[in-house]
Amino acid sequence: MDNNNDLHYCSFCNKAQDEVDKLITNSSDGLKVFICNECIELSHKAISQKKDRSFNSDRISDMKLLLKKPEDIKNFLSKHVVGQKHAQHVLSVAMYNHCQSMVQFHAISDIEIEKSNIMLIGPTGSGKTLLAKTLAKVSDVPFAMADATTLTEAGYVGDDVESVLSRLLQAANYDVVKAQRGIVFIDEIDKITRKSEGTSITRDVSGEGVQQALLKIMEGTVAYVPPQGGRKHPQQEFIQVDTSNILFICGGAFEGLDKIIEARKKGTSVGFGADISQSKEQKKKNALHDVQPEDLIKFGLIPEFVGRVPITAVLDELDHEDLIHVLTEPRNALIKQYKALLAFSKVNLEFSDEAISAIAKKAISYKTGARMLRAILESLLLDIMYTSGNGGFEGSTIVITKKMVELGKATVNHNNNGNVITVND
C-alpha cells in the first residue's frame, strides 16, 4: 500500500506511471498536474485532424479557382490582358497545378508536391504586372507587389524581404490562413543580379545577398513577419507565416539576356539553317523564347534562386496593333475608362479610329510599351476634363481627332449656338 501511495497518475486518463512509458509534470510548486505520453500523442492527433479539416474547408469555400480549368483561367486572363498568348498559356497551367498541389498538401501524406514559382521575362510595359494581378484576381487570393531594388539584406538601410510578406498580410486583412495562399509579385528582379559569376568576397547589399534572403521565403519556410513592416517598428509582435503555399512571381526586362542566349547558341544556325532575313527585333524576340536556366545564371541570378523559379514565361514587346487593342478591347480598357469619367459630367466622349492609331504610335515612340498610354490620354484630355468638371460641355459630344493627338492637347469650346467645336482641329 505504501508503494501505491508513491505512484503518480496521469491527470487525464488516470493511468499510473508504471502503466505508461513516460509521465510528465508541470514545474509549478503548487498543484501538480501530470500527463502521460499516450495522452500527449492523442492530443497531437486531435489537433492535427482539426487543423486539416479547417484547412481543406477553407480551400473549398474560398479558392474559387479550384473549380476552374486551365482553359477557364486563360479565358479570364485574355479578357484583361492584350496579347501574350504564350505567357497566358503558361500561367494558366502553372496556376492550375499550384492550386491542385495545395489541395493535395494534406490529402496525400506520402507525396509532397513542391510548388513551382514563376519568372516573367519581358520589356517594360509588356504586361508583367497586369498578368500577375489578374492571376490573383481569377484565383481570388490576396496579392502583394514589391520592387526588388528597394529590398536589402538584414542589417542594411532599406526594406527587408519580410516586408513583402507584411504587405501580403495587409492585403489579406491579417487573415494568416488566407495570406498563406496568396501571390507575391517581385518586379525588377533582374536589377539584383550579382556583378560577376564568381563568388563575391564583399557584401552585396542589393544583389546576391537579397537573392539569398528571398530564396529562404520562396522555397517555403515559417517566417516571422512584423505586421507593420520590420525595421521601422522593432518592438512589435511578430506573426508566423508559412510560405510553403505562397506563389512567388518574379518579373524583369533582362536587358542583354538575348545576347547571352545568342552566344550560347552560336554556331547552331550557321549555313543552310541560318535566317539572315530576320530583323534585329525579331532575332531578340526569338532568342528570349529559347532562354534556359544557364542563361539566367550567366546573367547574374544565383543557381539556387534559378532552381526555385522553374517556370519561365517570355512576354513580347507590344506593337502598334497591340497598343490599339490595349486602348479599346479589355474590360477596363483606357478609352472605356475616360469615356466613363466624362459620362459622369454628362459628356459623350468619342475617339476617331485615326486618333486611336495616333495615340498608339506616340506611345511606341517612348519605347515603354503600354505604360505611356495613360500619360498621353491625361495630357490630351486635361482641358476637357477641367471644363467638364466645372459643368461645361454638359449634354455635348466631343470627338477626339488625329490632329489633337499630334498636337498633344484637345482644346474645345462652345460656339454661339451652344454646339461644341474643336479649337485646335
UniProtKB/Swiss-Prot annotation:
Keywords: ATP-binding, Chaperone, Metal-binding, Nucleotide-binding, Zinc. SMART domains: AAA, ClpB_D2-small, zf-C4_ClpX. One of its GO terms (biological process) is cell division. Pfam families: AAA_2 (PF07724), ClpB_D2-small (PF10431), zf-C4_ClpX (PF06689). PROSITE patterns: CLPX_ZB. GO terms for cellular component: HslUV protease complex. Gene3D superfamilies: 1.10.8.60, ClpX chaperone, C4-type zinc finger domain, P-loop containing nucleotide triphosphate hydrolases. The keyword RNA-binding does not apply. Residues 1-55 form the ClpX-type ZB domain. Zn(2+) binds at C10, C13, C36, C39. ATP-dependent specificity component of the Clp protease. It directs the protease to specific substrates. Can perform chaperone functions in the absence of ClpP. NCBIfam families: clpX, PRK05342.1. Component of the ClpX-ClpP complex. Forms a hexameric ring that, in the presence of ATP, binds to fourteen ClpP subunits assembled into a disk-like structure with a central cavity, resembling the structure of eukaryotic proteasomes. PANTHER family: ATP-DEPENDENT CLP PROTEASE ATP-BINDING SUBUNIT CLPX-LIKE, MITOCHONDRIAL, ATP-DEPENDENT CLP PROTEASE ATP-BINDING SUBUNIT CLPX-LIKE, MITOCHONDRIAL-RELATED. This is ATP-dependent Clp protease ATP-binding subunit ClpX. It comes from Wolbachia pipientis wMel.
